[in-house]
Amino acid sequence: MADLANEEKPAIAPPVFVFQKDKGQKRSAGGSSPEGGEDSDREYGNYCPPVKRERTSSLTQFPPSQSEERSSGFRLKPPTLIHGQAPSAGLPSQKPKEQQRSVLRPAVLQAPQPKALSQTVPSSGTNGVSLLADCTGAVPAASPDTVARRSPSEAADEVCALEEKEPQKNESSNASEEEACEKKGPATQQAFVFGQNLRDRVKLINESVDEADMENAGHPSADTPTATNYFLQYISSSLENSTNSADASSNKFVFGQNMSERVLSPPKLNEVSSDANRENAAVESGSESSSQEATPEKESLAESAAAYTKATARKCLLEKVEVITGEEAESNVLQMQCKLFVFDKTSQSWVERGRGLLRLNDMASTDDGTLQSRLVMRTQGSLRLILNTKLWAQMQIDKASEKSIRITAMDTEDQGVKVFLISASSKDTGQLYAALHHRILALRSRVEQEQEAKMPVPEPGAAPSNEEDDSDDDDVLAPSGATAAGAGDEGDGQTTGST
């Protein structure tokens, strides 16, 4: 029977360590083995498969029955060896067996470190916790003999010690990370950030450049980025150039700057007005200059601008020239506004010479004290001389109408006697006609007196002949008077037509 038993049940091989594969194996839905918890733990990466060990005796090499394997529910997991820490061999823990079993805990979230880790983990589990390389490397280091020699209580103590050291390690790692961040904090604050605290950097760069150069001459360091910051150097140089240019251009005129000083400045206006008064001292009188200099203390912008332009304006004044008209030695008797017409023989019509001021002047003769008169007429505006004739005894004068007078006078253009027509108001025409008639009669009487004085005393036989001569003279004068009257009638008709 013993031989049959040996043939049916093969001998149990010595315990062998089973390593976890890269790919997780799914548990079958119908499986109800007591190692289901181990399969669930195997799915996560932070689990090392336990070593199946059974008690062996040197006497019997046959395995016990399945009931004995199920009755022994304790399965010992190999300790997780951490590099640099030895497993603690202390007293067995007094915790119950339910707590001695390793319970799956969530991953501990740690703050990201500024520097990348030098060692990278090849793979990770489903819950994000990286696989420990020590798990695969530490298990082969333990031989089956050492595992078999350890008691269950010692193994449980080692597992608990490792669990207690893991949070301590996490805390220590967090503390070290905080210290590293605190150490790197000042370094990052000292580092240059583009556009940050630009005013402080620009203001202090002129003061601290010399000191930094003296300090860094012997031992240059990388903590002073301003020494090599070309942007700040350019800003400092541009600021220096701007200050220099501002000092240089401060004396130049800027439109709209210091308007109150430039416009409403009484001293400046007084200086300008005084200079202008000096230039125009020869032209203006003292009273006018003093009145211009006296300006009110408070004046509006328009008044000040007008005063400034008046003071600075250079007036081109012509020298006063004495006007010589030739009438200085004559006394004016009558002047009137009128129109002057001249009779054209070729066209038999009246041609207007112009309108202006007609003056009747009297002048005493130097020879015998007799009165000499003349008519002078100048155009209005240009004062062009259009009539200048003396009154003589044979001058013909006739009143053509109520507002016109026809006279014979010397023409200034061709120096000949022509017939002129003077048209004016009825009042002026009546005064002019009366004045001319009175002077012509006086001239005629004087001519007659001169002729009588020159004539010798007549003989008694020669008297009839003289009477005949006088009658002949009267006959000669009569036709001339008739012709003059006919011309006067014709002139009246033409005057009415022209007017």
Curated annotation (Swiss-Prot):
Keywords: Acetylation, Cytoplasm, Nucleus, Phosphoprotein, Protein transport, Transport. Phosphorylation at Ser-58 promotes its import into the nucleus. InterPro entries: PH-like_dom_sf (IPR011993), Ran_bind_dom (IPR000156), RanBP1-like (IPR045255). Acts as a cofactor for XPO1/CRM1-mediated nuclear export, perhaps as export complex scaffolding protein. Bound to XPO1/CRM1, stabilizes the XPO1/CRM1-cargo interaction. In the absence of Ran-bound GTP prevents binding of XPO1/CRM1 to the nuclear pore complex. Binds to CHC1/RCC1 and increases the guanine nucleotide exchange activity of CHC1/RCC1. Recruits XPO1/CRM1 to CHC1/RCC1 in a Ran-dependent manner. Negative regulator of TGF-beta signaling through interaction with the R-SMAD proteins, SMAD2 and SMAD3, and mediating their nuclear export. The lineage of its organism: Eukaryota, Metazoa, Chordata, Craniata, Vertebrata. Interacts with CHC1 in a Ran-stimulated manner. Interacts with XPO1. Interacts (via its C-terminal R domain) with SMAD2 (dephosphorylated form via its MH1 and MH2 domains); the interaction results in the nuclear export of SMAD2 and termination of the TGF-beta signaling. Interacts (via its C-terminal R domain) with SMAD3 (dephosphorylated form via its MH1 domain); the interaction results in the nuclear export of SMAD3 and termination of the TGF-beta signaling. Residues 481-499 have a biased composition (Low complexity). The keyword Ribosomal protein does not apply. This is Ran-binding protein 3. The modification Phosphothreonine is found at residue 56. The gene is RANBP3. Its main location: cytoplasm. One of its GO terms (biological process) is protein export from nucleus. CDD domains: RanBD_RanBP3. A motif (Nuclear localization signal) lies at residues 49-57. The keyword Transferase does not apply. Residues 466-476 have a biased composition (Acidic residues). The modification N6-acetyllysine is found at residues 9, 21. The modification Phosphoserine is found at residues 32-33, 40, 58, 151, 265, 285, 287, 304, 471. Residues 1-128, 141-196, 264-303, 447-499 are annotated as: Disordered. Signal peptide: none annotated. GO terms for cellular component: cytoplasm; nucleus. It is found in: Cytoplasm; Nucleus. Residues 57-66, 116-128 have a biased composition (Polar residues). Residues 1-10 have a biased composition (Basic and acidic residues). The modification N-acetylalanine is found at residue 2.
